[in-house]
């Protein structure tokens, strides 16, 4: 009976198992297909769009209002103006209606205006005359002879104007216009010269482009949730089907994960230390501002360019940053994902990847050190900020690990999880194709697994979960956007660029060899060590079919992943060097593999090992043949950040090249000896022990990077450095804003001149100034810049201001002064003349010097011309003499010169720029009681002029104190992470804030990087500020680092007295393919 009972129990168990298998098959197939379909239709499902309309006049009054559109142009605009309004204007005329201030930069080129002058009424749009009518024809009101109203429309169909009631010679209504969609005007508000109550019939209505301001409908939310739930169900069912192989359950995390070694401690400590003191990545400020503004706007806009279009379909990672901003915007917190990804990459490398490559790798200590140190050396210059390369590197590594697990165990669940990981990795950025390369590298064995498994359970239960896993990312990418909006955003980015063709991939490597930050020592090593190890591994594995202790399949899949990624990168639309951060993790694995391949156990002949050592020394030569540059503020105090590293005048590149030549010649010598020659102790030490070439080189570079940052902190202390700012942030520090000092009023702080008989220039000119005049400055001398024509975006008001004052200043000068200096209080003396040249000398009056204190650390002289001085960037620059002489009380009650100071002069190579010469009080004796300016221009070359103003002791406040955290600021894309406490100009419902200030990087970066990137022609924010505001550069200094150009603070003044417009908001349900038309991106 017991036998029968057991057989019965077995039969029941078999039937139950069979039934469970059938259920799992059906669940995997049906849930997978439902998840796939639900994900695919998500982009097409409807959303609720927030609509916004600008209607004017508002509150029944003819007031100008502001409403700067982040898309710059509206969907459409209509305007109706009663002709009685024209008749009511004074004889001189005025602006009836405009979409920008008339005095804004290039206002006529960008905006729509209805202008009235003494003779005509003009409707102009973007410098095109739509219609012009004699003013005497536009007389009377509705019902009276003549014009009754002016009607203007601007849509995708074109821009047209009609003077209702006025006919042409043929008796037809007088109408004009052009069917050009690019004539739609830019709107920063509605501006008028009219005053008083709004007359009946006067109206303007503009539909604001809010296509990206949307939320999912209930239907779409249901579809997304259904896609996620069914995908999870399909994966669980697939896992159940995998259990049919009869193998016992394996631990998800193997026991080896709990074992920690000295390598683990060193690598993790390196990551933690670098997180605190290390350099940041190039676009941190960019991503920071996108994240900080996303919550207010309701979507992740590409804030600085491309007309406020979203990052989708790539960039879901930035939404994580936006969530983190709710906790804190401190650098060490917001950069935490990169730290976590770095540590996770090492744990995966040491516990999953290296064991898969074979016992020869995981059991060889130099290989472990090579992996850890190469990971650190490649991670440090690229992946310590907010750029997504670190997350992509982790995604690619996880994909590779899952593929290897799938191949090892012959199961499909890891394949599905690898597909899911690859999909989300590519959803971060197009360079996430590195994960797809990993999938393709393992494609053949995975296909074999699929074919083998489908014989037992069928095809659809295996394929459907894969389809669902690969497409569920669409529910994240299109959660709030539609297919139509994402396609439009993609078109905008492609049309404006950068969007480079595949055959320009050489640019990426060209940038790497330039002596710039992109081609700096650290960035070169991170890529070149990976490339050297990769091609070495390829050559050796091709030559040696079987290598003891090395798993050939995983090794080739690792190599194939990197080679495939290099191929895929050629199709990426941008060619930036920072994309090489993708290779940090997989490159470390290849480094470990190569360390074994070039060891004595594999390369028996010392010639080959020495040849590899020579190649590595040549890589080091290339790495040191550039600057030790780091991005923006990360370079502060770093040795050789603008020059090739050297010792006693000899560059390290030269030293490494000599070593390379010696080793290469020795390898050449070994080529002609027998294979056993050259196996001495030194050679074995260099190629076999811990001092093996790869870990030694990577360790050396890691120490160089860390040492550079530590040196920067020590040399900068107590002023700004990356590491010191991160530490201060723990107690509420505000980054660079705590160390940048601002003069709230540059007219304050001028000292009293001691009485004497001075010449015609007053105390500034002293008793007998020679060659200096009150107007000795050439026209178009502007503050902290070289004026160029045509003006580029982001320039200050003084670029376009009159070149002469309407009334002479205090000493008869008509030269406009910078920094808001009042010519009625501040005199000027300069040597510029177009006539006969002469040697010029000036010794000013003695000015009474107040006692030094913390609020007054400087004596400042505002000057222009080619002046001898010192700066961090340029070192000592030569020119004419402008020095500050300080004096002590003399024996007869007079003053005795006690010494002279050469100025810190940031703009020594920009002779036609007004700037502030800085003289530190700390360099003067405490008992100095007076100072005076001594200037000499002994050159007879007309370009060697100089101009000076009296010295002042300004009262300084930190930028954080002056600007605060509540006023809207245009933070240029480079500076955002360094100024975490300043409030960025926000945008919502298609309209932006109006900033009070602009913070820029240093002069060169502003001119080359931010001014051009944020240009209004590219859909950038400068298209708003240039048209609406007037910028003035303020006097600023970096505390205790007076010779450094940290950047600039510019104050915005409105061109017109206005108040923000009130928008009419509503909602509308839009399908996934609905579009209001194309965004106007052409000039």
Curated annotation (Swiss-Prot):
Compartments, as annotated in UniProt: Cell membrane
Keywords: Cell membrane, Cell wall biogenesis/degradation, Glycosyltransferase, Membrane, Transferase, Transmembrane, Transmembrane helix
Database matches in Pfam families: Arabino_trans_C, Arabino_trans_N, Arabinose_trans
Lipid bilayer topology: Multi-pass membrane protein
Main location: membrane
Entry's transmembrane regions: 23-45, 222-239, 252-274, 331-350, 357-379, 421-443, 456-478, 525-542, 555-572, 576-598, 611-633, 648-670, 690-712
GO terms, biological process: Actinobacterium-type cell wall biogenesis; cell wall organization
GO MF annotation terms: arabinosyltransferase activity
One GO CC term, this protein: plasma membrane
EC number: 2.4.2.-
EC main group: transferase
Function text: Arabinosyl transferase responsible for the polymerization of arabinose into the arabinan of arabinogalactan.
Protein family membership: Belongs to the emb family.
Annotated protein name in UniProt: Probable arabinosyltransferase B
Record organism: Mycobacterium leprae (strain TN)
């Amino acid at each position: 009976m017991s036998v029968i009972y057991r057989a019965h129990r077995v039969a029941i168990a078999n039937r139950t198992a069979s039934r469970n298998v059938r259920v799992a098959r059906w669940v995997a197939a049906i849930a997978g297909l439902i998840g796939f379909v639900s994900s695919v239709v998500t982009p097409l499902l409807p959303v609720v769009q927030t609509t916004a309309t600008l209607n004017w006049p508002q509150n029944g009054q003819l007031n100008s209002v502001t409403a700067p559109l982040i898309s710059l142009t509206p969907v459409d605009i209509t305007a109706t103006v009663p002709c009685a309004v024209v008749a009511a204007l004074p004889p001189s005329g005025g602006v009836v209606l405009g979409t920008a201030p008339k005095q804004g930069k290039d206002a006529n080129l960008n905006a729509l205006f209805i202008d009235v002058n003494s003779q005509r009424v003009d409707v102009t749009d973007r410098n095109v005359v739509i219609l012009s009518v004699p003013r005497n024809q536009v007389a009377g009101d509705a019902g009276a002879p003549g014009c009754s109203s002016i009607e203007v429309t601007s849509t995708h169909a074109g821009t047209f104007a009609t003077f209702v009631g006025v006919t042409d010679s043929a008796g037809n209504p007088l109408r004009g216009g052009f069917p050009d969609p690019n004539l739609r005007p830019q709107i920063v508000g509605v501006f008028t010269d009219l005053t008083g109550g709004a007359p009946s019939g006067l109206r303007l209505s503009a539909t604001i482009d809010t296509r990206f301001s949307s939320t999912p409908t209930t239907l779409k939310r249901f579809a997304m949730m259904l896609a996620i739930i069914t995908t999870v169900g399909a994966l669980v069912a697939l896992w159940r089907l995998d259990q049919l192989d009869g193998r016992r359950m394996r631990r998800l995390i193997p026991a080896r994960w709990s074992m920690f070694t000295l390598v683990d401690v060193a690598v993790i400590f390196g990551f933690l230390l670098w997180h605190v003191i290390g350099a940041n990545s190039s676009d941190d400020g960019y991503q920071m501002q996108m994240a900080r503004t996303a919550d207010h706007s309701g979507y992740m806009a590409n804030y600085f360019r491309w007309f406020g279009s979203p990052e989708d379909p790539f960039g879901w990672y930035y939404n994580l940053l936006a969530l983190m901003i709710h906790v804190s915007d401190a650098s060490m917190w917001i950069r935490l994902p990169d730290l976590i990804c770095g540590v996770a990459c090492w744990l995966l490398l040491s516990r999953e990847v290296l064991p898969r490559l074979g016992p020869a790798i995981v059991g060889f200590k130099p290989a472990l050190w090579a992996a850890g140190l190469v990971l650190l050396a490649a991670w440090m210059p690229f992946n310590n900020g907010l750029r997504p390369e670190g997350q992509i590197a982790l995604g690619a590594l996880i994909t590779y690990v899952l593929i290897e697990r799938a191949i090892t165990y012959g199961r499909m669940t890891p394949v599905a999880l690898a597909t899911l990981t690859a999909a989300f990795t590519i959803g971060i950025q197009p360079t996430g194709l590195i994960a797809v390369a990993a999938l393709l590298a393992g494609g053949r064995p995975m296909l074999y697994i699929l074919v083998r498994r489908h014989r037992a359970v069928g095809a659809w239960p295996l394929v459907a979960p894969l389809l669902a896993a690969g497409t569920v990312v669409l529910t994240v990418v299109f959660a709030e956007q539609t297919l139509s909006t994402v396609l439009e955003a993609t078109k905008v980015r492609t049309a404006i660029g950068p969007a480079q063709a595949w055959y320009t991939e050489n640019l990426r490597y060209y940038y790497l060899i330039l002596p710039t930050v992109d081609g700096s020592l650290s960035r070169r090593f991170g890529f070149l060590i990976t490339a050297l190890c990769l091609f070495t591994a390829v050559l050796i594995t091709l030559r040696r079919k079987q290598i003891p202790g090395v798993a050939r399949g995983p090794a080739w899949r690792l190599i194939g992943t990197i080679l495939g990624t290099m191929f895929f990168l050629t199709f990426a639309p941008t060619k930036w060097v920072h994309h090489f951060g993708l290779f940090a993790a997989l490159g470390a694995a290849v480094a470990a593999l190569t360390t074994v391949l070039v060891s004595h156990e594999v390369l028996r002949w010392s010639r080959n090992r020495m040849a590899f050592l020579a190649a590595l020394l040549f890589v080091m030569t290339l790495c040191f043949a550039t600057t030790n540059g780091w991005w923006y503020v990360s370079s502060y105090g770093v040795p050789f950040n603008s020059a090739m590293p050297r010792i006693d005048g000899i560059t390290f590149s030269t030293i490494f090249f000599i070593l390379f030549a010696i080793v290469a010649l020795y390898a050449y010598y070994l080529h002609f000896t027998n294979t056993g020659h050259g196996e001495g102790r030194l050679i074995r030490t260099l190629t076999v022990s811990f001092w093996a070439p790869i870990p030694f080189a990577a360790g050396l570079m890691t120490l160089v990077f860390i040492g550079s940052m530590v040196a920067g902190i020590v040399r900068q202390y107590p002023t700004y450095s990356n590491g010191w700012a991160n530490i201060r942030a723990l107690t509420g520090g505000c980054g660079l804003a705590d160390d940048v000092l601002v003069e709230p009023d540059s007219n304050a702080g001028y000292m009293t001149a001691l009485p004497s008989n001075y010449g015609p220039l007053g105390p500034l000119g002293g008793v007998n100034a020679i060659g200096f005049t009150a107007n000795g400055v050439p026209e178009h001398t502007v503050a902290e810049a070289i004026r160029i024509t045509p003006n580029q975006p982001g320039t200050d008001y003084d670029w376009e201001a009159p070149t002469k004052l309407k009334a002479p200043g205090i000493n008869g000068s008509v030269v406009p002064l910078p920094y808001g200096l009042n010519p009625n209080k501040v005199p000027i003396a300069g040597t510029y003349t177009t006539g006969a040249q002469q040697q010029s000398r000036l010794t000013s009056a003695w000015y009474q010097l107040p006692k030094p204190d913390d609020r007054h650390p400087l004596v400042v002289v505002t000057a222009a011309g080619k002046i001898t001085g010192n700066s961090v960037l340029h070192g000592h620059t030569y020119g004419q003499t402008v020095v500050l002489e300080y004096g002590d009380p003399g024996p007869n009650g007079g003053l005795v010169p006690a010494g002279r100071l050469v100025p810190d002069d940031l703009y020594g190579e920009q002779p036609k720029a007004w700037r502030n010469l800085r003289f530190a009080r700390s360099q003067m004796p405490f008992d100095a009681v007076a100072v005076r300016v001594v200037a000499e221009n002994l050159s007879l070359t007309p370009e060697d002029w100089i101009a000076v103003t009296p010295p002042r002791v300004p009262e300084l406040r930190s930028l954080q104190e002056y600007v605060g955290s509540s006023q809207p600021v245009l933070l240029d894309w480079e500076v955002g992470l360094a100024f975490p406490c300043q409030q960025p100009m926000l945008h919502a419902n298609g309209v932006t804030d109006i900033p009070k200030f602009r913070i820029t990087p240093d002069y060169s970066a502003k001119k080359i990087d931010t001014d051009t990137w944020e240009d209004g022609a590219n859909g950038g924010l400068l298209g708003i500020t240039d048209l609406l505001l007037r910028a003035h550069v303020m006097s600023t200094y970096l505390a205790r680092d007076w010779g450094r150009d940290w950047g600039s603070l510019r104050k915005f003044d409105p061109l017109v007295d206005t108040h923000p417009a009130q928008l009419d908001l509503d909602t509308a349900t839009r399908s996934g393919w609905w579009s209001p038309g194309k965004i106007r991106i052409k000039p």
